[in-house]
């Protein structure tokens, strides 16, 4: 299955001292890798706000040039609507929900989740924010932050 990287994964990639090994760890099956246009915006904003050095910026920009970037389109907007209404327990396509209270997601996370759903991609993340969507809209592969330590 092809994969979609959450923004937090790109942050770990940008910090890596062993880039190729880390990418192999994240993508052991050598699947196609994608990010959302939102992730690209988030990572560029982080680089500016956190004053990343040129080497770190160049590393992540070179990586982004080698992967697919999914832009906003009408299908993505529909997926966003489905996921947001599901997360708020207000999606008419569902009679029951496996969670008792609404799951408030950040808007950028909603866009990222929508890309995974629309494209049928496995989302690779360190966050718990997507857990309620797992096996409903897409699959999630969660990596614990401690698992990145050997690559720094």
Task: Outline where the language-model segments fall.
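Short, well-structured N-terminal submotif of metal-dependent ribonuclease cores
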Residues: 1-36, 45-62, 152
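A generic structural signal for short hydrophobic patches within well-formed alpha-helices
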Residues: 10, 19, 40-43, 77, ...
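Active-site neighborhoods of divalent-metal-dependent phosphate/nucleic-acid chemistry enzymes
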Residues: 69-122
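Acidic, PIN/NYN-like endoribonuclease modules and their adjacent C-terminal/linker elements
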Residues: 113-152
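Helix-adjacent hinge/juxtasegments
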Residues: 60, 64-72
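Short active-site oxyanion
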Residues: 1, 30-33, 66-68, 117-122
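General small-molecule cofactor/ligand-binding pocket signal
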Residues: 34, 70, 141-143
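Generic structural signal for small/hydrophobic residues in well-ordered secondary structure
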Residues: 6-7, 43, 80, 116
């Amino acid at each position: 299955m092809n994969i979609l990287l959450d923004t937090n994964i790109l942050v770990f990639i940008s910090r890596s001292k062993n880039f190729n090994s880390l990418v192999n760890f994240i993508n052991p099956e050598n699947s196609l890798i994608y990010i959302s246009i939102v992730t690209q915006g988030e990572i560029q904003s982080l680089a500016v706000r956190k004053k990343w050095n040129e080497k770190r910026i160049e590393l992540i920009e070179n990586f982004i040039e080698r992967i697919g970037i999914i832009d906003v389109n009408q299908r993505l907007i529909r997926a966003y609507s489905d996921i947001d209404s599901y997360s708020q327990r207000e999606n008419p396509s569902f009679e029951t929900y496996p969670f008792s209270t609404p799951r408030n997601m950040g808007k950028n996370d909603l866009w990222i989740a929508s890309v995974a759903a629309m494209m049928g991609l496995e989302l690779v993340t360190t966050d718990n924010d997507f857990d309620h969507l797992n096996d409903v809209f897409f699959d999630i592969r969660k990596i614990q932050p401690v698992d990145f330590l050997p690559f720094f």
